Structure formats: structure tokens, C-alpha cells
């Protein structure tokens, strides 16, 4: 059963890799939104359409350049941290219709794996899917963000564009050492709450 956010077209990639390690890559992609076979087999006996789910998962991973895994049926626990996060990103990108929230997607990863996840974020972004990236890693934020919402004392304190400010400026605004700039002009139709 889908959550209210998922039903609204919003997908999330969590810092703690919200995947089931013992399940396959394909099963994790469809966790909570399984496809059933047509006819009586699916409607009455609730038989899963494993082939359709595997084919879809394989295509989504291929689209994002992630088919370096041995098999779409291998257990997620056999993957590296970066590959696991890649599966989570692919799942979010496959089912999001509005935007993807990524909560510290590189926090538990090494340099090489973080690089791959940042490339995936850029790929998803290029495909036209908006991304809300929550991160304390300023180099990563500045690399992939179009706009940066800086929070201070649990409130939005400023919105900056990475091309207009340095990482040091962002940290200074965050800590209160620098006054926040006046609001930037947002694209037409954009709403900020």
C-alpha cells in the first residue's frame, strides 16, 4: 500500500537506505507497489508478476547506468553501499511524478560511491524531475543545487543560488556570522512555503 506522499507522486531516498537487504533488487524496487498477474491468478490468488517487475527494474537501472550488478534478482545485501543507494535512487526516480526528496543520500558512503550518487542525482535532474536535497555536505550541495535553502534555528533563513555565493558564505549565513541576503527571484510560478 502506498503512503500519502507516494500517492501524491513524491518519492524519498533515505540516508539509512530504506531497503530490505534479503529481498532482490527488483523486489525492493516494487516494495509496497507489487504488480500482480492478470486474471484470476492476480486478482484472486494474488500471484505477483515477477517477470514484469524484473523487466521494469532492469530498464530503470539501465536508464540510470546502474546495470553493473550481476543480476536484478540478487539480494540487496550483496551490493556495495553505493549500489544500494543507486537502487534507492532508481526506485524513487521510477515512481516519482512530482519530485524526489533525498535525505543525506551520500552520508554513509565513501568518496567513490558518493561521486556515483551525485552523478545519479544529476541524471535524474536532467530528466526533468525536481529534487529536494537535504544535506550538510556543502561541496555536494553546491555541486548539484540550483537553489539552496539555508535553515537556521529550525527556520528557513535564506535562499541563495550557488553561483552567487561561496560555501563559506553559506556556512556564515547558516551560523549567523553573515546577514542573509534578500530573497532571490524565483522562477515564474514557483511557490516557497
Language model: regions and residue ranges:
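Glycine-rich phosphate-binding loops of nucleotide-dependent enzymes
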Residues: 1-193
